[in-house]
């Protein structure tokens, strides 16, 4: 017997989330400008931690903007937070924990909260193959006039990487300079071309070294942030090609989409998740465009750290591979899925598959690995 995880999760209020986070170690919370609560990063800290763990109530998802760089639901958060304190719990135990803290019983004797294991497993398996409905979530938009504040000229850093003036102008890339703030500006638009956020590629060395290379831009008193897990960068420009070819290539960063715009022009069928994670919202957006093939092209894994043994590094590398398989599993019930993996040393550590040029990208495409349903389900 086990809890109905979806019913428990959907029933949670903001107050319930407060209770759960307080119990996990975040004694209070802050708020962002959109009214989303921000907690301490209990996901990867046993105590303390910065206020970089955001909760998006509509999506029922957390996002850690520091070490995790990842999206996850409340059950996964519980598993991670408990693990930081040396307590390993199962997924079902995490559901029970959440239900207990939130006081979810759904009736006398928990009759509605518990359901038969065999039945839920069968129905969940069958449910994977149902056609995904088109999504209708619309993110808040910002006034377009903010774009007039930016210097409308490309920065030499990106020009030096081979991105053309034409593409940088087409994607509205600019530059913002004020005391204590400097960086390349990257407007983000949704499928309907609405301005929903602006990210900044910092040019301040101290910020880059501290891990804040890409962050939401603040102009005056307005922070131009958005839920990146609910939008894919570049789709306002590439959706027609994606629909025409019925395929999509998913990168981590905006810059890779820009490079492919120069490589392929109107045949560019790429987008970017702006992290190393693919959310269910990303999947549903792409399925709504009718894709039949998905290519996952995340950055090459990091180099070994100082004093890290080869054995430990290989363990971490395998964990990264398993993570990619789990991301692929979001798509395998619906479409053909491929992963671009550099076995031949064509890329440097942390390179995007697009960073070494069109020929290298196409060589990686030729060597792509197809992921089956069983492989994606590890």
Curated annotation (Swiss-Prot):
GO biological processes: DNA replication
Superkingdom to which the source organism belongs: Bacteria
Classification of source organism: Bacteria, Bacillati, Bacillota, Bacilli, Bacillales
Single GO term (MF): zinc ion binding
UniProt-listed NCBIfam families: PRK08624.1 (NF006382)
Chain ranges passing through the membrane: none
Record's protein name: SPbeta prophage-derived uncharacterized protein YorJ
Annotated gene: yorJ
